[in-house]
Amino acid sequence: THSLIAGIRTSPCSFDSIGNFAISYVMTYLAYLPSLICGIAVSVEDIRLRRVPRLWIAIGCLAQLVAVIIVAVMANTMFLLVQAPLFAVLSAVLQAGLSMVKPGSMGFGDVTCTLAMGLAVGMAGLTAVVVWWLAMGLLGLAWMALWLRFDPQRRSDHAGKVPFAPAIVCAAVVAVIATTLL
């Protein structure tokens, strides 16, 4: 069996035609595309200028919500309409709480990036969210160590400031791939 969005399990043999088979498998990954595109754009901007544009996050969240609605209707699982935004908001609130523990460690852009990526990861369910947070921790620590060691901007205003959006986005990709393929 193949694990689809939100834990729906279907056998490839259960589809009534090759077309439905292809749509189901392709749609699984297309559903995450809005957050992926937004995440890549935001990561590049965070690396270059240490800012996460809120407008880009808003557009990415809106596009991902549309994808969530489409998937929920196609899979006939309206719980997805609650699950994805709930995990996204909970993750963003947790990230905001963590950033308040040590002020200056993470900015509001990292919190909004977590919200946008949380919509995609939240579609994959609780296991994906847990894997995402573990991957965020591990990749974040590795990214921080590498960035501080090889900082290409060490002679600029941004010296010593680590952009965390790439770690958040990479962890989201790892979590979605790990939980949908396994």
Predicted feature residues:
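A membrane-topology feature that recognizes alpha-helical transmembrane segments
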Residues: T1-L182
